[in-house]
Amino acid sequence: MRKNTYAMRYVAGQPAERILPPGSFASIGQALPPGEPLSTEERIRILVWNIYKQQRAEWLSVLKNYGKDAHLVLLQEAQTTPELVQFATANYLAADQVPAFVLPQHPSGVMTLSAAHPVYCCPLREREPILRLAKSALVTVYPLPDTRLLMVVNIHAVNFSLGVDVYSKQLLPIGDQIAHHSGPVIMAGDFNAWSRRRMNALYRFAREMSLRQVRFTDDQRRRAFGRPLDFVFYRGLNVSEASVLVTRASDHNPLLVEFSPGKPDK
């Protein structure tokens, strides 16, 4: 699906810009252009949320109350309505969306809002074999104050498929990019891990990429068949705080995680 795969970048005061995938994932292991750090603080705050195409009331108030202080907001099923684009460009330096499919008015897909401009951007799409709808993912990279580069993966995994072949296939290009990246990584989103086989495939991928799972003490994540759908994985960072916000503003609850950029605890 490469020819139809692109990201749209929204920046305040500028026309939307189309970003195509890089020619080679190997470029991520080479010198990337310099940029401003994602955070000047000791902490990196992220919000991860399947926003349900903004179909329910109060989604904007949740973003205003909990998203505006985050350095990164990773949305799934984000529809580029004027209200969401306005919030994104008013509170973040960049907002990158990968349209999974185009609805009658506004495209829907993963969208990453960031407090700094990414120095690398790679949109990805995978088509669901049964419904023929696409799910999207986005890989971006941001400088950190300690000169390291943080890779951020925002993913909405395929939902309707027989077996886990397509599910695992969607993770392959993400794994290729993580493998070429030597710095810290955050991989988060709606993984649709509603079966034991999907969960096993996801955990196997995380182990192969040396990623840890963020644990939530009061775990109010959305579940299907008793299994959580939303996850945050990481490496090269420490988790300072992690919580789940209970809300009716979507069919998923937002995940709030605060990282410290130091070397991870053993």
Swiss-Prot record:
GO molecular function: catalytic activity
GO CC annotations on file: cytoplasm
Gene3D superfamilies, per the entry: Endonuclease/exonuclease/phosphatase
Protein localization: Cytoplasm
Gene name in the database record: yafD
Entry coiled-coil feature ranges: none
Pfam families reported in the protein's UniProt record: Exo_endo_phos (PF03372)
Cell membrane among keywords: no
UniProt entry keywords in alphabetical sequence: Cytoplasm
InterPro entries, alphabetized: Endo/exonu/phosph_ase_sf (IPR036691), Endo/exonuclease/phosphatase (IPR005135), UPF0294 (IPR022958)
Annotated family: Belongs to the UPF0294 family.
Source organism per UniProt: Escherichia coli O139:H28 (strain E24377A / ETEC)
Record bears the keyword Mitochondrion: no
Annotated protein name in UniProt: UPF0294 protein YafD
